[in-house]
Amino acid sequence: MQEFDKSISFDGRDIRLKMGTLAPQAGGSVLIQSGDTAVLVTATRAKGRDGIDFLPLTVDYEGRLYAAGRIPGGFLRREGRPPEKATLISRLIDRPLRPLFPHWLRDELQIVATTLSMDEEVPPDVLAVTGASVAVILAQIPFKGPMAAVRVGLVGDDFIINPTYREVHNGDLDLVVAGTPAGIVMVEAGANQLPEQDIIEAIDFGYEAVQDLINAQRELMTDLGITLATSEPPPVNTAVEEFIANRASKKIITVLGQFDLGKDGRDAALDEIKATEVETAIAELPETDPVKQSVEEDPKLVGNLYKALTKKLMRKQIVDDGVRVDGRKLEQVRPISCEVGFLPRRVHGSGLFNRGLTQVLSLATLGSPGDAQDLADDLHPEDEKRYLHHYNFPPYSVGEARPMRSPGRREIGHGALAERAIIPVLPPQEDFPYVVRVVSEVLSSNGSTSMGSVCGSTLALMDAGVPIKKPVSGAAMGLIKEGDEIRILTDIQGIEDFLGDMDFKVAGTDSGITALQMDMKIDGLSMEVVSKAIMQALPARLHILDKMLATIREPRPELSPFAPRLLTLKIEPEHIGMVIGPGGKTIKGITEQTSCKIDIADDGTVTIASSEGERAERARQMIYNMTRKLNEGEVYLGRVTRIIPIGAFVEVLPGKEGMIHISQLTEGRVGKVEDEVGVGDEVIVKVREIDSKGRLNLTRLGIHPDEAAEARRNASRG
């Protein structure tokens, strides 16, 4: 491809597309740049593997530290396993892209987005999403595009397109909208308890901006003389399809109408129909029968067509009758139960949340500021995280037996969504300096486990005594679209997620939304439908919230006795080195003496963590004494450190020494200093003078017995 540049004037900032220069062997490649942020996005297509029945699409985002002029840490000094942020951006690219490929496509597809340069103004993620659309178009991969994405922020009362990092951080909204000419295909947002109507307006505002980027891609296609690639669906084997429908339809409809079967009973009944009414009947056909020959040629044909028939009949039941497979109405939430304090208090907080067959146990742990997650080797400009949510999805939660692995993209994505939902209600760090980690263990899954994790997290935090501003609940909405008929489902379960067209998760408080995430399986939704789904989620969220508040109305007033106690004090930044000491000697000594964990921030904030308040207070007093300003007339219990002919040096506080002149040791004449004191002796001294160089002149004279007693008490406290 020849080199080609195109600049798009977009909302006051140019976006530049550069093609034909980099990655010439990739199917399609584009360097998309805004400001000093530049992302190379490639799309490559290869022959698919035999026998697969899914689209093998891989999306990888790579954030290189050289893009920000930095060298990685660690021994190897190179990037290692992608950080969580990179995984989330990979998912952000994948989610709006995947539904736009033909569902019958079986070629290997790989999208790779690599940030080559990055400034502190323009995030690379939405550039990568739009760049992926351009790369796919250039690679001539069948695709219902063009597709583009923008970020929407809220500064004051005004929505803005593609805000800077600072504007997002200081604002109340971080929303990404992706769309095609057919409608909206993906929404993801974190918000500071914004009302539903504000969120709807923000999505609409973003989708209008998306149209500009879609039109720019159309212009690019015209300039390059290319069109969107298309792919015809493979022919359906109508003979086998009709055979299965004739044998199984009525029995499937009967099973779908038996609402008391439950998930396992329904699955077993459907499997039984498939085995007895379809597979057994095909096995009994003569070898010359076209149906039997087709099935022998494609062993997966029966399974795929039977699944398609079940999907069709379930969707028809919802559209025609307004009844779901478990008998619920479209807007009805499954039965809910909650429990807090489920585990002993050695676990700082625990919450068990049940919704239908979905069960999530969330566990909260409180730590000191030093437990914050260090993001120093992440390309993005966050330094650390003080609230962490981790989501685990073991195989037994769906009745499977398979090897346990480290968290995959799904687990990371679900954990991040639940984390995002809770962050707006956390107390300010100055009021509650703890680092908080919540782990959500999915013990049983039948849909909406990420929103179950939001509810479980809220329960666990309140049980742990974390003073959250408001409790957060969440619900997952689904969609069935058959022609012009649209049905929105509240609180979808697993089969409705699998056979439906949308998974729209909404979390928030009774004041507004804190997080949402919408994924589509079709090529776009209108604003009208998106708006209706958001509004339909509100009564569901409030209903769930009522159930949670019936279990625990407010955070516990006391922390678990096993949670660390934190004390803080502020020292002058220039004293930090003194507290740490050479090679960390001083602070290690305090830690060993008090069994406390001590963290010192760059601004001089010292946080002391201990399971025992007395130990923490002793450490605080030791650091305070080291860094406090001494005044003339104050009395201390000190220790003699060395003797010289004219006097003795006494350490009155850690790191603070003064001298007692021989004439100040006692009343009357002293022949030798050693006659009065020796090295290691404890002595009561008063600060007689602080000279112009800050040196302490001490005395043992004129000290009242009460002053001496107070000095001894202070010394005993550290």
UniProtKB/Swiss-Prot annotation:
GO CC, one annotated term: cytosol
Q: EC number(s) per UniProt?
A: 2.7.7.8
Keywords, A to Z? Answer: Cytoplasm, Magnesium, Metal-binding, Nucleotidyltransferase, RNA-binding, Transferase
Lineage from the top down?
Bacteria, Bacillati, Cyanobacteriota, Cyanophyceae, Synechococcales
Phenotypic consequence of gene deletion? Essential, it cannot be deleted.
Binding annotation for Mg(2+) = D497, D503
Localization per Swiss-Prot or TrEMBL: Cytoplasm
Query: Which protein, by its recorded name, is this?
Result: Polyribonucleotide nucleotidyltransferase
Please give the Gene Ontology molecular function terms for this protein: 3'-5'-RNA exonuclease activity; magnesium ion binding; polyribonucleotide nucleotidyltransferase activity; RNA binding
Cofactors named for this entry: Mg(2+)
